[in-house]
């Protein structure tokens, strides 16, 4: 599996709205914790260490 960095989410604006809404009403600490949990859930779903390493490099 390779890292996909081209747009790949159907209705990206809808997803972004869902993501923002998930943070509604949270404190900064709660929002940071939500982001951390989401990252770990998605990393577990991907499961491929090489893809995760490539994603970390791309994000940095």
Model-predicted regions and their roles:
Residues 15, 34-35, 52:
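N-terminal alpha-helical segment
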Residues 13-16, 39:
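Short amphipathic alpha-helical surface patches that serve as generic macromolecular interface elements
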Residues 34-46:
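An amphipathic alpha-helical micro-motif enriched in hydrophobic residues
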Residues 1-4, 10-14, 21, 28-29, ...:
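N-terminal intrinsically disordered, cationic/polar leader segments
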Residues 49-60:
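Short, charged early-sequence alpha-helical segments and their helix-coil boundaries
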Residues 19-20, 24, 37:
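Eukaryotic low-complexity, mixed-charge intrinsically disordered interaction/regulatory segments enriched
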Residues 23, 43-46, 59:
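Generic structural signal for hydrophobic core residues of well-folded globular domains
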Residues 26-36:
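Structural motif
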């Amino acid at each position: 599996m390779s890292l996909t960095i081209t747009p790949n989410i159907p209705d990206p604006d809808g997803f972004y709205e869902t993501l923002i809404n998930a943070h509604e009403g949270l404190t900064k600490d709660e929002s940071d914790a939500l982001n951390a949990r989401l990252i770990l859930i998605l990393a577990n779903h991907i499961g491929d260490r090489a893809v995760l390493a490539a994603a970390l490099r791309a994000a940095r």
